[in-house]
């Protein structure tokens, strides 16, 4: 309706899905202070403050993120936020890529959400929540699974930083060096 009429409007809501669907720009406030302004996509992909990182989307806050494979502790950044889409949960033995970056976990909860399953997994005493497509084999509570966490947001008291899993490296990568030789030359293999 707002688009059809061509008017500017302010819409106040606590429903994130509604806000990101109708807004061209979002302003997130915390106790009367503006935490971040931007398009819904900018805010979702680049949360500036710890409050925004924890507020926008579905998140799990983790204190000991350095116990997760591929993530080293950064000084003064004591907590991390992990979103479900940052996690891949596979049945044991079914992870096709980045096996060296994954770790084993135990499923502690499974919730049917209509178009997906939300799966809570305990990894080294840390519980994280990931999503799993209904097209994949079902996973049950108590089952051992492989968990790959691609990235997370770490934060200090004021700012949020995106951290990628340092263990995620392609396996079986080969490097070729090409040498241009203008004259016949003998190459010895060492």
Regions found by a protein language model. Give the residues of each.
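Single conserved hydrophobic/aromatic residue that forms the stacking wall/gate
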Residues: 179-190
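Short, conserved beta-turn/loop elements at beta-strand boundaries and strand-helix junctions
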Residues: 110-116
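Residues located in well-ordered beta-strands
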Residues: 39, 51, 104-106
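ABC ATPase nucleotide-binding domains
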Residues: 1-48
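Beta-strand/loop nucleic-acid-binding surfaces
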Residues: 126-137
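SH3/SH3-like beta-barrel fold
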Residues: 119-121
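Glycine/charge-rich catalytic "coupling/switch" loops of P-loop NTPases
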Residues: 60, 65-110, 136-178
């Amino acid at each position: 309706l707002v688009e059809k009429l061509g008017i500017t409007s302010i819409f106040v809501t606590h429903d994130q899905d509604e806000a990101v669907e109708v807004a061209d720009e979002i302003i997130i406030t915390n106790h009367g202070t503006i935490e971040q302004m931007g398009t819904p996509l900018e805010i979702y992909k680049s949360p500036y403050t710890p409050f925004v990182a924890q507020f926008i989307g579905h998140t799990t806050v983790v204190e000991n993120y350095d116990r997760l494979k591929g993530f080293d502790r950064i000084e003064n950044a004591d907590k991390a936020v992990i979103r479900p889409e940052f996690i891949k949960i596979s049945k044991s033995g079914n992870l096709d890529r980045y096996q060296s970056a994954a770790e084993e976990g135990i499923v502690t909860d499974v919730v049917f959400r209509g178009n997906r399953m939300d799966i809570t997994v305990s990894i080294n005493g840390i519980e994280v929540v990931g999503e799993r497509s209904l097209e994949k084999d079902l996973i049950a509570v108590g089952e051992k699974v492989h968990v790959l966490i691609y990235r997370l947001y770490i934060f200090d008291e004021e700012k949020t930083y995106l951290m990628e899993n340092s263990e995620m490296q392609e396996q079986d990568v080969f490097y070729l060096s090409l040498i241009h030789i203008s004259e016949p030359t003998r190459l010895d293999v060492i």
